[in-house]
Amino acid sequence: MNSTHHHGMHTSLHFWNRSTYGLHSNASEPLGKGYSEGGCYEQLFVSPEVFVTLGVISLLENILVIVAIAKNKNLHSPMYFFICSLAVADMLVSVSNGSETIVITLLNSTDTDAQSFTVNIDNVIDSVICSSLLASICSLLSIAVDRYFTIFYALQYHNIMTVKRVGIIISCIWAVCTVSGVLFIIYSDSSAVIICLITVFFTMLALMASLYVHMFLMARLHIKRIAVLPGTGTIRQGANMKGAITLTILIGVFVVCWAPFFLHLIFYISCPQNPYCVCFMSHFNLYLILIMCNSIIDPLIYALRSQELRKTFKEIICCYPLGGLCDLSSRY
């Protein structure tokens, strides 16, 4: 992270900071006509309280998801274990962004001697954010593969996706993503790191898209074939497709919330001096808000799509001071 910071500017990741602050370091250069000093080149300011508030909301929501999956044995299935991994990643991304707001505020208000320590703390947070981003993508891909197996390898599914194997997969995901996140921050001065991250993002999306095209095309054929059979197969197939649709919604929200940020990185690499690119990059803080909103929206999707999860949420909430409210609602 750069040692010079623009007041009030919130950033994420070491090289993301460089891309944002780069807008100001070259502010004296003519980047285009018709742009005033207070115009599109100024970073959109978002109050630090907004980041902290979103971080707290995400923390509470995703902890609720993790506790619910751990508490309810009916949710001890590969898909929900991968959802739990995704919830951890979402929580870390959002909480780290909120924490980095505090760190940057301290960095702007402390003396030079204390800044080096604050920068080191900020780099650690950046590593957590980067690792969590990669873990989010890998968890989504794992859920996609799991749904693929449930639909096309239903008879062998329980032999393929054992609890032990799922645990190994999740452990490997976090180990690889943690190492990659640390390396990305260490070598963040190189543009190749940004290109690598962009490539990973679009490669994973392409893999998930290819799985889904095949999944939904073949699933339609399977549904037609089993339509003449007794209802159990149809019910099971319908449940599997519901899980696939849930993941489709999760991926859609992920793309919508993260795409502006990755477009920001692409513009930083390809056209850092173009007036239109600079104008887009000046809204960097808004893209961070979208990323944090993704971490808040995901638990709502889980709850809306899973009756079992909603039931467990209610049981957990009723164990605490809201128990009286839950008892009242259950009577009506």
From Swiss-Prot:
One of its GO terms (biological process) is adenylate cyclase-activating G protein-coupled receptor signaling pathway. Its main location: membrane. Residues 70-81, 146-165, 216-248, 305-332 are cytoplasmic. CDD domains: 7tmA_MC4R. Changing residue 298 to N: Associated with less backfat thickness, slower growth rate and lower feed intake. Hormone receptor that acts as a key component of the leptin-melanocortin pathway at the intersection of homeostatic maintenance of energetic state. Plays a role in regulating food intake: activation by a stimulating hormone such as anorexigenic alpha-melanocyte stimulating hormone (alpha-MSH) inhibits appetite, whereas binding to a natural antagonist like Agouti-related protein/AGRP promotes appetite. G-protein-coupled receptor that activates conventional Galphas signaling leading to induction of anorexogenic signaling in the hypothalamus to result in negative energy balance. Homodimer; disulfide-linked, also forms higher order oligomers. Interacts with GNAS. Interacts with ATRNL1. Interacts with MGRN1; this interaction competes with GNAS-binding and thus inhibits agonist-induced cAMP production. Interacts with MRAP and MRAP2; these associated factors increase ligand-sensitivity and generation of cAMP. This is Melanocortin receptor 4. It comes from Sus scrofa (Pig). The gene is MC4R.
